[in-house]
Amino acid sequence: MELTIEQIEGVMSLVLDGRRRLDLRNVRFIDPYGLLLLDLVLRDRAEGSAPLNVVWPTHPPVRNWMQAMGLAFDVSATLRPKSRLPNVRTALQPITRIEDERGVIALVNGFDARLAERYPLDESPRRTLIRIMLELFQNIPQHSNATGNVSDAHGIAAMQDYRDGIVLAIADKGVGMRASLSLRGEEKVGSDAEALDAVVLRGLSRFRDPGRGQELMRIFRMVRSWDGTIAIRSGSALLYHDPEHGADVHDVAPFPGVQIALCIPTRVFGIGEVDGAPEDGFNEPDE
């Protein structure tokens, strides 16, 4: 069992359908996107009235990585930290809280420094990744509480490297794309799928100024040109692209906010495949 960009939706559906017991004991791999969605949906259940009994993974590398990345196994009793240093070398960038625009540059610099410690990145793609992170992180304070109705508006982000790719994930539990677009005051956006299409494929935003918006559209096209994988989830819709099958929009279990994952090939940054076998404690996908 794996909790990845492609497979986490099964767990989301179970939890959001009201399942009272979630058995994760056989999970052998989880990526940052799966980790963030699991964190958000479990906290959502903990804040509600329906208790959820979670049987956590028993595979030591997976447990070690999840804890090093900052996931609290007792989500109802532990507040998520603003940032946590990893306690094993292989946790690249643990779950980090994004609150306001003033702190975004410092967070991006921290992500960049963690990656630079591990690899000698080519300068041009490194700057591109910094711009991508700036855009995605700024989207949290700019859009997640666009209506002013979210009591604790914040986002979370995490990053991990693998043999042939780097996965960056950003997520919030805000108002979502459809509610944000509704503030344009134009025609009503009928569905979450239509909102995804408008924002990601046509470059619209809640701002009418033609100089605003289009960031997600540019990032989507960039990742696609790199033969990478990208997932953008909002409400009941998921836009998923991989180099083998292209892009498609899927119906998913409704959940508030926007959740994004990018899987960028390491060769884009001038990095060859990561050499060496994974050390003990490493959360690595099966071959």
Segments predicted by a language model, with ranges:
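Flexible, glycine-/charge-rich segments associated with ATP-binding catalytic modules
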Residues: M1-L16, S76-K82, P86, L201-E287
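Conserved ATP-binding N-box helix of the HATPase_c
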Residues: Y33, D39-V41, E123-Y162, F220-V223
